[in-house]
Regions:
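N-terminal amphipathic alpha-helix/helix-capping segment at the start of soluble metabolic enzymes
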Residues: 1-26, 91, 201
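Alpha/beta catalytic cores of nucleotide-metabolism and tRNA/nucleoside-modifying enzymes
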Residues: 1-4, 201-212, 218-271
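Active-site beta->alpha loop and helix N-cap motifs at the rims of alpha/beta catalytic domains
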Residues: 3, 11, 42, 47-49, ...
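Short beta-strand/loop segments at the ligand-binding rim of alpha/beta enzyme cores
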Residues: 20-26, 95-105, 146-157, 204-215
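Catalytic cores of alpha/beta
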Residues: 36-47, 161-171, 213, 217-234
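Glycine-rich phosphate-binding active-site loops on the catalytic face of alpha/beta enzymes
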Residues: 52-63, 124-130, 135-138, 177-187, ...
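Glycine/Thr-rich beta-alpha phosphate-binding loop at enzyme active sites
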Residues: 70-72, 80, 156, 166-207, ...
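Catalytic beta/alpha-barrel core
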Residues: 78-82, 125-138, 152-161, 166-167, ...
Length: 271
């Protein structure tokens, strides 16, 4: 793992660079689900299974981009009393193994204050921040705070993002550019859209940093197809959160369930 003196942006760059000739694998997990210690165990299982980075969600009451599986896990975490403080505690422990990119909606971020939030995130050892509902027009202050704290503010683009907007967003990307593979919310889908290669080529033409794909990737075959379409990184969320939720409901170990899936996904990217 990169030394703790590196900035978060540098740790993310190192994680992508350490995956030569293949796409980096970034599992998404819900912070504080099933509880803080449980989410740390899941994050450590991801590291053991071959993940390169981890995306850690902050549970929120009105998550616009989350599909039903991730929304339900976030609701359970909130009902169990998980707070942002607890998620940052989990981030600090997972960050000892892998770079952690926090996914947080704008409301908790703005309520806490942008500079304070960025400082707390950096102090926890996190490497980056994704704010899915942060408008480009309001991103300036957040990006300045993240830059000052050494954090990568990772923007999202969609297949429907027009060229002029892509040209405005991509050069400001830090760490990586998050490309949403489909229009809509997160969730499992039957396959990788045939148009993905074109979407990725357009993104990579404008992006100074690696381009990662998320939303709708749930199998090793999907992951391999996204990589073949040109993705520098592959983000898998709903499938892993569903496995963790099913394990909790069944009284089995969610960390083991996620480990087995991440190992299979990592294998799909290492073929």
């Amino acid at each position: 793992l990169a030394s703790t003196t590196d900035t978060g942006t540098e740790r993310i760059a190192a994680a992508f660079a350490a995956a030569p000739g293949r796409a980096a694998l970034m599992p998404y997990l819900m912070g504080g689900f099933p509880d803080v210690d449980g989410s740390v165990a899941i994050g450590e299982a991801c590291a053991d299974a071959g993940a390169d980075l981890v995306e850690l969600g902050v549970p929120f009451s009105d998550p616009l981009a989350d599909g039903p599986v991730i929304h339900a896990a976030g609701t359970r975490a909130l009902q169990a009393g998980v707070t942002l403080h607890g998620v940052l505690q989990a981030a600090a422990r997972i960050a000892e193994r892998l770079p952690v990119v926090l996914m947080c909606y704008a409301n908790p971020l703005l309520a806490r204050g942008v500079e304070r939030f960025a400082g707390e995130l950096a102090a926890a050892g996190a490497s980056g921040l994704i704010v899915p509902d942060l408008p480009l027009e309001e991103a300036g202050a957040v990006r300045e705070a993240c830059d000052a704290a050494g954090l990568a503010l990772v923007p999202l683009i969609a297949p429907t993002t027009p060229d002029d907007r892509l040209q405005a967003i991509a050069p400001l990307a830090r760490g990586f550019l998050y490309t949403v593979s489909v229009t809509g919310t997160t969730g499992e889908r039957t396959g990788v859209d045939a148009s993905l290669a074109g979407v990725l080529a357009r993104a990579k033409a404008h992006s100074p940093v690696p381009v990662a794909v998320g939303f709708g990737i749930s199998t090793p075959e999907h992951a391999a197809a996204a990589a073949a379409a040109g993705a520098d990184g592959v983000i898998v969320g709903s499938r892993l959160v569903r496995a963790a939720s099913e394990a909790v409901d069944a009284g089995t170990d969610p960390a083991q369930a996620v480990h087995d899936l991440v190992a299979a996904l990592a294998g799909g990217l290492r073929r």
